[in-house]
Swiss-Prot record:
It comes from Natronomonas pharaonis (strain ATCC 35678 / DSM 2160 / CIP 103997 / JCM 8858 / NBRC 14720 / NCIMB 2260 / Gabara) (Halobacterium pharaonis). One of its GO terms (molecular function) is 2-dehydro-3-deoxy-phosphogluconate aldolase activity. This is 4-hydroxy-tetrahydrodipicolinate synthase. Keywords: Amino-acid biosynthesis, Cytoplasm, Diaminopimelate biosynthesis, Lyase, Lysine biosynthesis, Schiff base. PANTHER family: 4-HYDROXY-2-OXOGLUTARATE ALDOLASE, MITOCHONDRIAL, DIHYDRODIPICOLINATE SYNTHASE. The active site is at 136 (proton donor/acceptor), 164 (schiff-base intermediate with substrate). It catalyses: L-aspartate 4-semialdehyde + pyruvate = (2S,4S)-4-hydroxy-2,3,4,5-tetrahydrodipicolinate + H2O + H(+).
Length: 294
């Protein structure tokens, strides 16, 4: 697997649960196959959108195994990050053993290391696990940005081949792209609403929430942008804009799970402490999805 694999659309997969909050592996398998058939470029299970924070280690790896087994021709990039370096290393090693093609590692959260500690954390995993790895900057959840200098330094590691940008700061993303463009390094949007401007700066695609429910349109948008057809890409951005915004009207993945239920893809059941979507937001989401079907 080369860094070129990290170009295009990679759905941050939801995880289906039954009414007792058990993982529904049969539906998960169907979901993975549906996304592959829609033309996505890879799958990202057990990330934030997949509710990895509520899973045991064994459940986490079972989800990876199910997705790996379900698909034929697209890479599986398993979430394996933690705020505990030993835990991140264990999850990464087990994901590799389960057949993952690559790893997505959120930056350490809650204990909020300084840049030196963050770089050591990532290098420890990259030195030990011989898979391509994407570092994930989402300060709204972790409490701290990955410093640009840290990202630039990590881009020199042969196993660290990508950066998921979810800070909402286009200047920061642009600087990372500019300073790593000579490296074996790809920058992917982690915010659907910013995918188009990030690609315009030199990004290579997205790890997408919206692609769970609108994979074909998301693939078309990203494909047009990567081909330089920004007129078509803008048209698709306008079509999907309300969806991008509504999927974050409450904490992700609450709205996307409701959307999956509305589209009869899987149940909206989530694990506690996530709550069902508020009624007024449910109606707003229903209208957005209905507009996309007209």
């Amino acid at each position: 697997m080369t860094h070129d694999t990290f170009t295009g659309v990679f759905p941050a997969m939801t995880t289906p649960f039954d009414d007792e909050e058990r993982i529904d592996h049969e539906t998960l398998r169907d979901h993975a196959q549906r996304l592959e058939a829609a033309g996505v470029d890879g799958l990202v299970p057990v990330g934030t959108t997949g509710e990895s924070a509520t899973m045991s280690h064994d459940e986490h790896i079972e989800v990876v195994e199910t997705v790996v087994d379900a698909v034929d021709d697209v890479p599986v990039i398993a979430g394996s990050g933690s705020n505990n370096t030993r835990e991140a290393l264990e999850l990464s090693e087990r994901a590799a053993d389960a057949g993952a093609d690559g790893l997505l590692l959120i930056s350490p959260y809650y204990n909020i290391p300084e840049p030196e500690g963050m770089e050591t954390h990532y290098r420890t995993v990259a030195d030990a696990v011989d898979l391509p790895q994407i570092i994930y900057n989402v300060p709204g959840r972790t409490g701290r940005n990955i410093a640009v200098e840290t990202a630039v330094s990590l881009a020199e590691h042969e196993n660290i081949v990508g950066y998921k940008a979810a800070s909402g700061d286009l200047n920061r993303v642009g600087e990372v792209i500019e300073r790593t463009r000579e490296e074996n390094f790809e920058v992917l949007s982690g915010d659907d609403a910013l995918t188009l401007p990030i690609i315009a700066q030199g990004g290579t695609g997205c790890i997408s929430v919206s692609a769970n429910v609108e994979p074909e349109r998301t693939v078309a948008l990203v494909g047009a942008a990567l081909e330089g057809d920004f007129t078509r890409a803008r048209e698709l951005q306008y079509e999907l804009g309300d969806l991008f915004r509504t999927l974050f009207i409450e904490t992700n993945p609450i709205p996307i799970n409701e959307a999956m239920d509305m589209r009869d893809i899987h149940s909206s059941t989530m694990r506690s402490p996530l709550n069902p979507l508020q009624p007024e937001h449910r109606e707003q989401l229903r209208e957005v999805l209905a507009d996309l079907e007209r």
